[in-house]
Amino acid sequence: MSKIRVLCVDDSALMRQLMTEIINSHPDMEMVAAAQDPLVARDLIKKFNPQVLTLDVEMPRMDGLDFLEKLMRLRPMPVVMVSSLTGKNSEITMRALELGAIDFVTKPQLGIREGMLAYSELIADKIRTAAKARLPQRVLENKPAMLSHTPLLSSEKLIAIGASTGGTEAIRAVLQPLPPTSPALLITQHMPPGFTRSFAERLNKLCQITVKEAEDGERVLPGHAYIAPGDRHLELARSGANYQVRIHDGPAVNRHRPSVDVLFRSVAQYAGRNAVGVILTGMGNDGAAGLLEMHRAGAYTLAQNEASCVVFGMPREAIAMGGVNDVVELNQISQRMLAQISSGQALRI
């Protein structure tokens, strides 16, 4: 079996050395070359034809975003960004995902060597996922036509969405067409702490609905989307007649916190047939069991189709478990969700 060929682009000699050690410690991949800046990387890409590129965000001569934009236009390939955990860099990382990066890794703030080596399995998993990924289609910067939707008379209706690899842009594609009269949405996207606030703020600028990072105890309102904070579970709860957000630090589920299964199970319990469940692109099986619970509770459930997924893992598992009513292309999901909510026919078997 041939190894995954990886090229590292980072201006730090230590980071290049550590990434080389990490990649070469896994038998199914190899570091074919390492470059200190994008201009050197350009020549090495031609020479070694890597399958996956790891790219630092901040570098001299040409920054990572400029290089990524040119790369995706001229020679599209799977890219995993490597970013320091700062407010500025979290915004840059979100922009990189918009430009077509598959995923990202955060650099440890202290103890670089020990921290990076501790991330060895995580980095290897992201490299493997990137190597198999379908390159995402760019979502246009201009806003798509807003869907028409009759204002709801009840705040009982609710939409739950789960995603992982490739999910930031898929979520954007689903939320942008939604009108302000849409039902509330609860969203779990696998993401580390420090990035979900930037993700929510960026979506809020692009969408007609209000998008925010979820806060424990807040009331769930129509026309609002609530994003699970990084490294914390998001659940639906009730306070009297009202839906409420619950945020907690429970153990990881399916190796993830936040976990899509945790969200979906709570929605099955408290919203039942008043809910719509949507599982989007992502590696693994998180969300499959929870979506089945939603389906059994009477919710209408959707999975993104393989052709429009960056990674057809989570949707595939959900379909295989029998918890999916319909499999839909990404650009049709918004319309299908609202049509189902408006029809009032959440239960479909």
Swiss-Prot record:
Database matches in PANTHER family: PROTEIN-GLUTAMATE METHYLESTERASE/PROTEIN-GLUTAMINE GLUTAMINASE, PROTEIN-GLUTAMATE METHYLESTERASE_PROTEIN-GLUTAMINE GLUTAMINASE
Source species: Yersinia pestis
Boundaries of every Response regulatory domain copy: 5-122
Record protein name field: Protein-glutamate methylesterase/protein-glutamine glutaminase
Location in the cell: Cytoplasm
Enzyme class: hydrolase
Recorded superkingdom: Bacteria
Keyword Cytoplasm: yes
PTM comment: Phosphorylated by CheA. Phosphorylation of the N-terminal regulatory domain activates the methylesterase activity.
Record note on domains: Contains a C-terminal catalytic domain, and an N-terminal region which modulates catalytic activity.
Gene label: cheB
PROSITE patterns with a match to the protein in the record: CHEB, RESPONSE_REGULATORY
